[in-house]
Amino acid sequence: MLSKEVVELSKQHSIIRDIFEYGMKRAKEVGAENVFDFSIGNPSVPAPKEIDETALRLLKTADPVDIHGYTSNAGVLEVRENIAKSLNKRFDTNYTAANIFMTIGAAAALGICFKTLVDGPEDEVITFAPHFPEYAVYAQGAGCRLKVISADTRAFQINFEELEETISEHTKAILINSPNNPSGVVYSRETI
């Protein structure tokens, strides 16, 4: 038997997915080079060549178990150490590997964060419209409510007045996504 809650969530309409499907259909009809897909955020810029070169080198030289096997829950220690060093160098911080928790993507990271912060159904996570529709799924999966702050439709920056009114003793997190998904807006330095 499937969870009724998840089944209902899966039935919810997503205009973003509709646009993506339409774009794929049009690409077959008129050629992919004539369709600009601004829907689901698939990367359109290749990774730096150093990434490709390193991946190929590791595939040829590293132990296959190291490449394809499981890691510790937080991720490979050496990688987390290097990420901490990079952050410290670029942003003048003092992170260590203990501050870095690697996941397989943003969805997993948000799910883990929500589960870590949420303690009961009265808890809430706040985000800003427009927002990635699956944020509601992550909040529901963590057992809390997602509160959505209306968009400032002039510039799509954060509506601080409504944010202040919405924050309560039940607020566990405020999810800020910049560049915003789905609008693509980057919050200004003043907003941040």
Predicted regions and their residues:
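N-terminal small-domain helix-loop-helix segment of the aminotransferase-like
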Residues: 2, 9-105
